[in-house]
């Protein structure tokens, strides 16, 4: 069961926090809100009922007006893949440690291009890296995330596809 491209490229301005509360069997969100150019924020509890969801790919990619994401968006979920989650969200200003506020997200193995092009995102990339100890695919995760406090200290293979 998946929400694939459900609201992609629509005029969605606001997302109700309980939007997916009646769908606990969902296992994947892909391009669900991709390209929603008027969306400015994502509520913290949006996925709280998605207890079986493992895949979150391109969910908010190209949401160019997105500025804020609620605390612990993917907390307590069995997420394994968060590739391209916020790809191209150039206005996203939320601290990466606010979005991922637990000490560990051990189920996550793919963070490829998660924050690619999020030039306004704040916080510390190295801290996020420490929270996802089992990641095996992470190229471009922080590509052009120049507002991170430690952007210049990040390993090259988290910024591009080079070691």
Residue ranges and their predicted role:
Residues 1-163:
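Solvent-exposed loop and capping/linker segments of extracellular ligand-binding repeat ectodomains
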């Amino acid at each position: 069961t998946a929400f694939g491209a459900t609201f992609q490229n629509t005029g969605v301005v606001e997302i109700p926090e309980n939007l997916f509360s009646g769908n606990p069997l969902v296992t994947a969100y892909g391009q669900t809100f991709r390209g929603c150019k008027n969306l400015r924020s994502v509520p913290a509890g949006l996925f709280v009922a998605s207890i079986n969801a493992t895949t979150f790919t391109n969910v908010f990619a190209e949401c160019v007006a997105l500025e804020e994401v609620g605390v612990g968006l993917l907390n307590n979920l069995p997420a394994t893949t968060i590739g391209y989650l916020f790809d191209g969200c150039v206005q996203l200003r939320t601290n990466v440690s606010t979005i991922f506020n637990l000490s560990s997200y051990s189920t996550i193995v793919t963070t490829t291009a998660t924050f690619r092009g999020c030039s306004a995102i704040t916080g510390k990339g190295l801290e996020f890296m420490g929270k996802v100890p089992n990641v095996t695919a992470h190229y471009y995760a922080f590509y052009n995330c120049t507002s991170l406090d430690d952007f210049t200290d990040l390993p090259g293979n988290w910024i591009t596809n080079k070691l």
